[in-house]
Curated annotation (Swiss-Prot):
InterPro entries the record matches: Expansin/allergen_DPBB_dom, Expansin_CBD, Expansin_CBD_sf, RlpA-like_sf
Organism: Oryza sativa subsp. japonica (Rice)
Protein name (Swiss-Prot/TrEMBL): Expansin-like A4
Protein family membership: Belongs to the expansin family. Expansin-like A subfamily.
Gene name of the encoded protein: EXLA4
GO terms classed as biological process: plant-type cell wall loosening
Chief site of localization: secreted
PANTHER family for the chain: EXPANSIN-B3, EXPANSIN-LIKE A4
Domain Expansin-like CBD: 188-281
Length: 313
């Protein structure tokens, strides 16, 4: 086999491996999140310590920075944070004390990982659960039922809640965006983070390519480069082999089971893309998982003492 044949064979082999890895990622993702769409699970929620507020959270482990989130932000403990996979996921929390709390609860988006001091862990063991959500005082007060003052609820500091994952809903003009991380170096080293990921979804794969390459040219197919999640920061996608810009991108979006490609129509990153900048992809993510609860989900969620818990609807 000549040198050109070797190169083409290597390209084909790399593509096959990438597709196999993508399949495994999508399947694993579906299995891990299938129970997110079922009946609500039980947890506790507490108020973030003063003077922590929303700006501190958006600068936390998820690295959203100064980007306006439009939703109440929350920090979650490690088991729910999932090494960063939960960044940008939306949840509905409803206090279980009907004397104090209303039916609608509060909707939050995950922006940080909550650290749990030893004394708080002890407090929540006696409360019957592990601390999983921390929210701002304003978000905590939003759970109060009509006729209950914000002060009356917030003085509780910690409450037991039902929680479930829900679709993220941003205003109509808000589309999926990418933030170029500070560690990026134009042109080859690129690290990005997604913002305003709507629906009830996870991003399972990301690829970038030169925006000026069009099918059926060979450069269109050969210029696509896959990105990988950064170790220790799954919300960041990175590559050291980025093509010269301007760049377009495509992503695999999963919603509980299966996945689909979404591809930008044109340029997303300009040739002179810069670290710290946010760029609009032109894509709108609205997929919602089909509510089909497996037996394993039902067993996982049947943790009440009397077996007659009210389902969060």
């Amino acid at each position: 086999m000549d040198d050109n044949g070797d190169v083409h064979f290597c390209h084909r082999a790399t593509a096959v491996v990438a597709l196999l890895l993508l399949h495994l990622v999508v399947v694993a993702n579906a299995a891990a999140h299938s129970c997110d769409w079922c009946t609500p699970r039980h947890s506790t929620v507490s108020i973030l310590p003063t003077p922590t507020h929303a700006a501190h959270l958006t600068g936390g482990a998820c690295g959203f920075g100064a980007a306006p989130m439009e939703l109440n932000v929350a920090a979650v403990t490690a088991d729910l944070f999932r090494h960063g996979h939960a960044c940008g996921a939306c949840y509905q929390l409803r206090c279980r004390d009907r004397r104090l709390c209303g039916e609608d609860g509060v909707k939050v988006v995950v922006a940080d990982m909550a650290k749990q001091p030893e004394q708080e862990g002890e407090m929540n063991r006696t409360a019957g659960g592990s601390l999983q959500f921390r929210i701002t005082e304003d978000a905590f007060a939003a759970m109060a039922k009509q006729g209950v003052s914000a002060h009356e609820l917030t003085r509780q500091r910690t409450l037991e809640v039902d929680f479930r994952r829900i679709p993220c809903e941003y205003r109509e003009s808000r589309r999926l965006a990418v933030r170029v991380e500070e560690a990026s170096r134009n042109p080859t080293h690129l690290a990005i983070r997604f913002l305003y990921q709507g629906g009830q979804t996870d991003i399972a794969a990301v690829e970038i390519a030169q925006a000026n390459a069009t099918p059926p040219s060979s450069s269109y197919y050969s210029s696509w480069r896959y990105m990988t999640r950064r170790d220790g920061a799954p919300g960041v996608w990175t590559t050291s082999r980025a093509p010269v810009g301007p760049l377009r991108l495509r992503v695999v979006v999963t919603a509980g089971s299966g996945g689909k490609w979404l591809r930008s129509d044109g340029e997303v990153l300009p040739a002179d893309w810069r670290p710290g900048e946010v760029y609009d992809t032109g894509l709108r993510v609205t997929d919602v998982a089909v509510r089909s609860c497996s037996l394993s989900c039902a067993i996982q969620d049947m943790d009440s003492d009397d077996g007659e818990e009210e389902e969060l609807r």
